[in-house]
Regions:
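Ser/Thr/Gly/Pro-rich low-complexity, disordered linker/stalk segments of secreted
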Residues: 1-15
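Mature extracytoplasmic or organellar-lumen-exposed domains after removal of signal/transit peptides
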Residues: 12-400
Length: 400
């Protein structure tokens, strides 16, 4: 899938951008740019995610149908349908990763991490196993690193049905003695529980933005909050560095200091489905959309209005190049990490990301890292200077 926003069944209010510009005194207005961003990207993304997550978690939806089909002749076809729906859910979640602003970031990102806890630390596979092995689970009482789309990745795509807990963990003590079909069924039931939690979190964030709910939109677009909202937005967009560049590419590939070994496969975001590259693509696509909100405004217009059209064009070109390469790669991040097996391989990877204008035949994922790094370097210097915002904490210096 492309990660596009697609159709949204939830009724959306008309964008307030045009009305904002009618009262603006110049051809470009920062508050109006933020209005377009909120009304045409952020809120529609949460509306789309709410719809997709609700359908995925419904008992009669694709996941529920797969759970019912386990150990029947329809199991394979039902799983294929569930996998397609899961990809749509993951794409919708990955789009929201780039704008974890306000409600999604409140209380230490508690709602965002219910969607995807990747930025909070490693997935607790034992914790997920415990959910699958237990009855009457209160999902809200479970740790965030046992929930979200990574837990679904483990439950639905890990072919090894044995638990990963230590022997003293009582909840999983009899798990390995269960039949294969029983373990698959219980994992599927756990996936349904986690899918419902994702759906609830998505609905909560969407409601918090809407006028009928928490109306965070009004606060976000209040004239006196323009600078704070601009800063919050650019802080969120730095996910491109910490989440996409470093987390999904640099750390597992062993490029940055966060990985102390040759490679760090444990940091791959979606190791069981091998869907991590598509997540990178979706992140790049939504960042590109946020950079150029619509034909009349966006961060591109902001930068051009400040007198730096060449910087705006460079961002667009570099984003286009990175997306083109990412979509052309026919291997997974897991495979690329496994292929870096020696110091000479590591050197080849280093050369690849240091010279991203030439795609490496052996390690195109390292080339992609270099392309994303090029965008991030411009983000940390040109973008923050021209837009007049601060670099968020933790991004002051590069770490590769």
């Amino acid at each position: 899938e492309t990660g596009g926003s697609g159709s949204v069944s939830t009724d959306l209010p008309e964008s307030g951008f045009s009305a904002c510009m009618e009262s603006a005194s110049a051809a470009y207005d920062t508050r109006c740019m933020l209005t377009a961003l909120a009304d045409e990207i952020v809120i529609p993304n949460y509306a789309q995610l709410t719809d997709v997550a609700k359908t995925f978690a419904d008992a009669s939806g694709p996941l529920g149908s797969y759970c019912s089909a386990i150990s029947t002749a329809e199991e394979s076809a039902a799983f294929a349908d569930a996998e397609t729906a899961w990809k749509g859910l993951v794409a919708a979640v990955q789009r929201t990763e780039m704008h974890a602003i306000g409600p999604a970031s409140d209380n230490a990102f508690s709602l965002q991490y219910r969607l995807n806890s990747y930025m909070s630390g490693a997935l607790s596979t034992c914790g997920v196993d415990s959910i699958a092995a237990s009855s009457d689970v209160e999902i809200n009482a479970r740790a965030l690193n046992t929930r979200g789309i990574r837990a679904l990745d483990y439950l639905l795509f890990n072919s090894n049905l044995k638990h990963t807990c230590a022997p003293q963990v009582t909840s999983t003590s009899g798990w390995n003695d269960l039949s294969e079909s029983e373990r698959k069924a219980r994992r599927c039931d756990a996936a349904m529980l986690i899918a419902s939690d994702i759906s609830d979190a998505a609905s909560s964030i969407h409601a918090a933005w809407r006028a009928e709910g928490g109306d965070y939109r009004a606060s976000f677009l209040q004239e006196s909050n323009t600078f704070q909202s601009l800063q919050a937005t650019t802080d969120a967009m730095f996910y491109l560095e910490k989440g996409t560049k470093d987390g999904k590419l640099g750390t597992p590939l062993g490029i940055i200091a966060a990985c102390p070994d040759l490679t760090c496969p444990g940091f791959v975001e979606a190791p069981y489905s091998e869907h991590s590259l598509q997540n990178v693509i979706t992140n790049l696509e939504i960042w590109n959309e946020m950079f150029s909100s619509n034909n009349e405004t966006g961060f591109d217009a902001h930068i051009e209005n400040e007198g730096w059209p060449e910087v705006s064009e460079a961002f667009k070109t570099n984003l286009e190049d990175a997306l083109e390469l990412a979509k052309s790669i026919d291997t997974s991040i897991v495979s690329q990490v496994n292929a870096i097996a020696s110091q000479s391989d590591e050197t080849e990877c280093t050369n690849a990301y240091s010279n991203p204008d030439t795609t490496s035949d052996s390690f195109p994922m390292c080339t992609l890292y270099g392309m994303v790094k090029r965008i991030v370097d411009s983000l940390k210097i040109d973008f923050v200077t021209i837009v007049n915002v601060d670099v968020p904490g933790g991004s002051q210096s590069d770490n590769d």
